[in-house]
Design a protein with these regions (language model features):
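Short, positively charged low-complexity motifs
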Residues: 9-10, 34
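N-terminal, intrinsically disordered charge-dense segments
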Residues: 18-37
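Fold-level recognition of mixed alpha/beta catalytic cores in primary-metabolism enzymes, strongest
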Residues: 137-140, 145-146, 150-254, 270, ...
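Metal-dependent amide/peptide-bond hydrolase catalytic core
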Residues: 44, 91, 222-425
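Acidic/His- and Gly-rich active-site-bordering loop/insert found
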Residues: 40-145, 164-165, 394
Length: 425
């Protein structure tokens, strides 16, 4: 089904606070986009979702920025259909989660969850403006179309129908998923305390509409090394922070190889082993100066059942030994290892009830699978919600320049939401 071109949606809106924004979050004089959406309900939900996607993508919600403009837009959109939302803000007050119940407040509902933040575009060679959805050759291009504003747009487009159902859908929108799943826990805790027990939680990460019942957990660490500067020809007169950092990184590589050799090849994950990768590194000021500082960040992604504390125990011992040896030579030097983020794995629980329900929505009978990336599924599962992942688009098309989603996937996501609305009517 082609997406009707007549469903274009005005992006300006005027929230209750009196400020006017365009979808970029800049103050403008606009019309109420929520009213425009209401007027467009005569066209297909897919077309409405496509218009909402334009709006959501145009908000720059890179994890380093505030997401409040997007959250306010969603609040006002939901309010038009009588759906009241609750914010769960961060300590600084510049970001917020949002959750809302469409339909009656009764047990047995479905959580639809997605994150509002996206990865940066800086340093990437985009063919067009990443904050404007471009349609070409059967694809939708733009930052977040696949991961995961496409899913959010589809869910929001179906709110008018979901709000009239006899069984609730609980919408959950988080922040800071891309930097260690930091935002969702506070929202999940609040939801667990305030909504009747749901049947399941569906995390709409891009899975090509396949059912995912397991994902790896993630732990992110920062290593800072403080050296003692001296001329690089006088190595005994100082300590190069870079050389110490390289020694620690070499140990990480050894641990990674050991994990690969000991992995359970039949655990359903690809790759099957827990992985260690270094994503950031910096240090030193000049080639002829023993580096006074060094810093690097690494992550550990482990499948369920891996004792991550045991995996990293040798590294902690090494850092402690290096720290003591450096301090014995020069005061103020040393090594500091800090965990800066973590999220648990999602473990297949052996129950087929949730998967069977979602198969009715996807229309596919393919067996459930597992993925190597981390997501918020494990956090929902730890709160006692039966949880799985299913969403349009592919993780292989996310996080890269010209991020894209097949129109066929977007339409498959719309059919999924249509069937959900029918099931809960």
């Amino acid at each position: 089904m082609a997406i009707p071109k007549t469903a274009a949606l005005p992006l300006g809106y005027t929230p209750a606070g009196g400020r006017s924004y365009n979808a970029l979050g800049r103050n403008v004089k606009g019309v109420a986009a929520q009213r425009a959406i209401s007027d467009s309900m005569a066209v297909t939900d897919t077309a409405v979702a496509r218009s909402i996607l334009d709006t959501l993508v145009a908000f720059d919600t890179t994890s380093s920025r505030s997401n409040l403009a997007l959250i306010e837009w969603v609040e006002n959109y939901l309010a038009q259909f009588g759906v009241q939302a609750e914010r769960v803000a961060n300590e600084a007050g510049d970001k917020a989660n949002l959750f809302a119940t469409c339909g009656p407040s009764v047990a047995g509902g479905v959580i639809l969850s997605g994150h509002s933040d996206v990865v940066p575009v800086e340093g990437q060679a985009w063919s067009s403006d990443p904050w404007t959805v471009r349609e070409a050759q059967g694809r939708l291009y733009g930052r977040g179309v696949s991961d995961m504003k496409g899913f959010l747009a589809l869910a929001l487009a179906h709110v008018p129908r979901l709000a009239k159902g006899t069984c609730p859908v609980h919408l959950a929108i988080s922040y800071d998923e891309e930097v260690g799943c930091k935002g969702a826990p506070a929202m999940i805790e609040r939801m667990a305390a305030s909504i009747p027990a749901p049947r399941l939680a569906i995390i709409g990460e891009p899975s090509s509409m396949r059912i995912i019942t397991g994902h790896k957990g993630i732990s992110v660490f920062e290593v800072r090394v403080r050296g003692h500067e001296a001329h690089s020809s006088l190595t005994g007169h100082g300590i190069s922070a870079n050389m110490v950092a390289v020694e620690i990184m070499a140990h990480l590589s050894d641990i990674a190889r050991k994990l690969e050799a000991e992995a359970d090849a039949d655990n359903g994950f690809d790759p099957p082993q827990a992985t260690l990768t270094i994503g950031e590194m910096e240090g030193g000021t000049a080639a002829n100066i023993l580096a006074g500082h060094a810093r690097f960040v690494f992550d550990l992604r482990a499948p369920p059942g891996v004792d991550t504390a045991a995996v990293l125990a040798p590294l902690r011992d090494q850092c402690a030994a290096l720290d003591a040896a450096m301090k014995a030579r020069f005061a103020g030097t040393g090594v500091k290892l800090t965990q800066i983020a973590s999220a648990p794995p999602m473990t297949p629980d052996g129950s087929d009830d949730a998967s069977a329900f979602v198969r009715q929505l996807t229309g596919e009978n393919a067996p459930a699978s597992r993925v190597a990336y981390a997501a918020e599924g494990g956090q929902f599962q730890q709160a006692g919600f039966p949880t799985l992942i299913c969403g349009p688009g592919s993780i292989e098309q996310a996080h890269q320049p010209d991020e894209w989603m097949d129109l066929e996937q977007f339409e498959a996501g719309a059919r999924f939401m249509d069937r959900l609305a029918e099931q809960l009517a």
